[in-house]
């Protein structure tokens, strides 16, 4: 598998259940991937049962780069899955969409991202499901940016969104980021990130109407300013399920 400098030094694989079928999707970064060389691999385990049989290792077509730091998320209402990765060979962002049967890819969505480093996680994915529309969400670390840099996806079509400028400002170097979807109100999610100043931030994203997406500074201030480390998942979050 792909690594930064030594084995097991970065989150280079992820697994999800399809929400309707219960099929398993395992995606990882193959070590042969590089800048301009497809490094994404996947296997599925159909059936939604503990005794399911894993299919063959498959290389999804059109993916273009290594996938050193990656994340996938399942749509809570369908069999769709969203994928995002940044490679450490070239710092390129690639975005993927699984429709329940096949992967499609948007390569080089951003070619100047922060290069993944040991124990970092510089990309996060999620879904927003509203009354009349659904969007996938990808947040990533753009090079030298203190803003929240993000894409939304409508099925397999990804659109770069205007940067959200957080208050207070977040340091330009990120350590670890994650997205958590609200299991009750599926039209909102929380994005959390640590930065190089040992700060922790939480921001909320809400989908309203047909396609209105609104970020809020739900933390108001840094939740923590003295994290003991900024890498290797230095925080945890969960919605209270009523």
What spans do the regions from the language model cover?
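Extracellular, repeat-based ectodomains that mediate carbohydrate processing or recognition
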Residues: 1-242
């Amino acid at each position: 598998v792909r690594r930064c400098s030594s084995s097991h030094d970065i989150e280079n694989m992820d697994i999800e259940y399809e929400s309707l079928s219960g099929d398993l999707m395992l995606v990882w970064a193959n070590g042969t991937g590089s800048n301009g060389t497809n490094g994404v691999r996947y296997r599925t385990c159909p059936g939604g049962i503990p005794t399911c049989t894993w299919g063959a290792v498959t290389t999804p077509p059109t993916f273009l780069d290594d996938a050193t730091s990656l994340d996938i998320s399942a749509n809570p209402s369908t069999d769709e899955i969203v994928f995002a990765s940044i490679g450490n060979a070239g710092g390129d962002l690639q975005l993927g969409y699984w429709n329940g049967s096949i992967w499609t890819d948007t390569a080089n969505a951003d070619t100047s991202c922060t290069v993944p480093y040991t124990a970092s996680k510089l990309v996060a994915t999620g879904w927003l499901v509203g009354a009349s529309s659904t969007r996938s969400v990808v947040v990533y670390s753009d090079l030298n940016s203190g803003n929240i840099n993000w894409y939304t996806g409508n099925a397999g079509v990804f659109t770069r969104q205007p940067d959200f400028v957080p208050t207070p400002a977040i340091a330009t170097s990120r350590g670890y980021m994650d997205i958590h979807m609200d299991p009750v109100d599926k039209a909102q999610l929380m994005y959390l990130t640590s930065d190089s100043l040992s700060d922790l931030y939480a921001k909320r994203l809400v989908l309203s109407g047909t396609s209105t997406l609104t970020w809020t500074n739900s933390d108001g201030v840094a939740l923590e300013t003295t994290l003991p480390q900024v890498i290797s998942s230095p925080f945890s979050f969960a919605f209270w399920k009523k």
